[in-house]
Regions:
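Nucleotide-binding/hydrolysis machinery
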Residues: 120, 124, 130-133, 142, ...
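Conserved post-Walker A coupling segment in P-loop NTPases
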Residues: 126, 140-208, 218-234, 299-304
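Dynamic helix-loop-helix/coil hinge segments at AAA+ ATPase domain boundaries and subdomain interfaces
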Residues: 115-138, 192, 397-406
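Bacterial C-terminal helix-turn-helix
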Residues: 348, 385-454
């Protein structure tokens, strides 16, 4: 694979570059980190310029950046955590050993495999989105599903796609001859029948048990067990399930013999299970058994840039032959509307709009059902102003001055538009109301003032 590398003001030693080449990495030097592609940032001192560069790489989105220190002394733990928090994917101290380059190459190779799966038609056909928050969640799921044998706990609000993630988890599982997914909706389990639902029962175990029956643990043997809304399980049932999750063996209700089962466990919840533990509503030991890995699915309000992508995805599903486009008014309406039910809410709205649409032309504001339309012409502007006010309140509360707020807002707007235009500064400048030259000068000034990348 090909990566870029950047060392402010100089070039790394030839021996370092040769070691990277021998490890199988094709690499090229750049004067400043590009907008796209994985790369390495070399540093011989830890300063604001390094942190700003990593923060900008993180704001741009989805790329992998390894920070490699060429320092005579060991990098302190606090500095490593700060670099990771600023946006580095990993931090290495180059020790000139034969393994250093291979360790770096191994990271990039794994990440490349993960991203190949994330970009694959298998994933894109069912899970649409390109925001950083969404890509990060997909990467976490691919990592645990395809490259480990661990269980995973999916967290997130209702309607964020946890069931689709569970299905993808099973699909990406690399086990051979795996069986199907067994879904247990924990909100519908009747306490009196929970033993039979999970463990199965023998004939005559209770009134009405006219024959033996397999439960979820038997049915999931060789496959995947999905416990949806696991936070709704009562404490006594959590205790009963704990042994099975830990030992992978169970007894049927009314039976005496132990049965082995081998399944991968996926759990999902819209509750904060850490708080539930504090209040005694969820067992700590059960939590740590089901949460070998956790993957949080962001709400739609944290990935609004995905709304047009999702809307187009749903329209393509509803109109596979000739999907209509969205005119500007509908596009803006979808972007600024609130979605209490997250992606599920958006899908239902798009479905109603498409069903109301007639003709080969684009979907227009008149296709929006009357009860869904904004109540006034200023509602969209009001929502944008409310979102902006919340962001400014947060910035001021954190101690930023007016000058800092203005500068940060301007830099963030530039970064977002440049990313959306895939690095095309001419189009980005037009959207920002600047000339090409003005945008280039603003970026150059930030670089000269030590604020990292333009």
């Amino acid at each position: 694979m090909e990566i870029w590398h950047w060392f402010p003001g100089r070039q790394p030693e030839a021996a370092i570059l040769a070691a990277l080449t021998q490890a199988g990495l094709r690499h090229y030097a750049c004067e400043s980190p590009p907008l796209h592609g994985p790369g390495i940032v070399f540093f011989d001192e830890i300063n604001d310029r390094l942190f700003n560069l990593l923060r900008e790489a993180s704001c741009r989105g989805v790329e992998r950046v390894i920070a490699i220190g060429l320092l005579p002394a060991r990098i302190k733990s606090a500095a490593i955590w700060s670099l990771l928090g600023a946006g580095a994917s990993d931090v290495f101290a180059w020790d000139h050993s034969s393994n250093a380059a291979h360790e770096v190459a191994a990271r990039f190779e794994r990440w490349e495999k993960v991203d190949e799966i994330v970009r694959s038609p298998l994933v894109k056909a069912n899970l649409a989105g390109q925001s950083w928050a969404w890509i990060r969640a997909l990467r976490q799921l691919v990592e645990v599903a395809h490259f480990t044998a661990s269980s995973v706990l999916l967290t997130g609000e209702s309607g964020t796609g946890k069931e689709l993630f569970a299905q993808l988890f099973h699909t990406l599982d690399s086990r051979k001859n795996k069986r199907d997914v067994v879904v247990c909706d924990c909100t519908t389990i009747v306490p009196e029948l929970s033993g039979s639902e999970f463990f199965g029962h023998e004939r005559g175990a209770f009134t009405g048990a006219v024959s033996a029956r397999d439960g979820a643990f038997a049915l999931a043997d060789g496959g995947t067990l999905f416990l949806d809304e696991v936070g709704e399980l009562p404490l006594n049932l959590q205790a009963e399930l704990l042994r099975v999750v830990q030992e992978r063996s169970y007894k049927r209700v009314g039976g005496n013999s132990w049965h082995k089962t081998n399944f991968r466990l996926v759990c999902a919840t819209n509750r904060n299970l850490n708080e539930e533990q504090i209040h005694g509503r969820f067992r700590c030991d059960f939590y740590y058994r089901i949460a070998s890995w956790t993957c949080h699915l962001p709400p739609l309000c944290e990935r609004r840039e995905d709304i047009p992508v999702l809307a187009k995805h749903f329209i393509n599903q509803l109109c596979p032959g000739s999907p209509p486009d969205l005119d500007d008014a509908v596009h803006e309406y979808l972007l600024t509307r609130d979605y209490i039910g997250n992606v599920r809410d958006l899908k239902q709205l798009v479905t109603r709009i498409v069903q109301h649409h007639v003709g080969p032309g684009p979907i227009t504001a008149g296709d929006i059902p009357p009860n869904e339309r904004p109540r006034g012409s200023n509602e969209s502007n009001d929502r944008r102003e409310q979102s902006l006010e919340l962001a400014v309140r947060s910035a001021v509360a954190s101690g930023l001055s007016l000058r800092d707020v203005e500068r940060s807002a301007g830099e963030l707007a530039e970064r977002i538009v440049i990313e959306e235009e895939q690095g095309n500064l001419q189009r980005a400048a037009a959207r920002l109301g600047l000339t090409d030259r003005a945008l280039q000068m603003r970026r150059a000034a930030r670089r000269q003032n030590g604020n990292g990348k333009p």
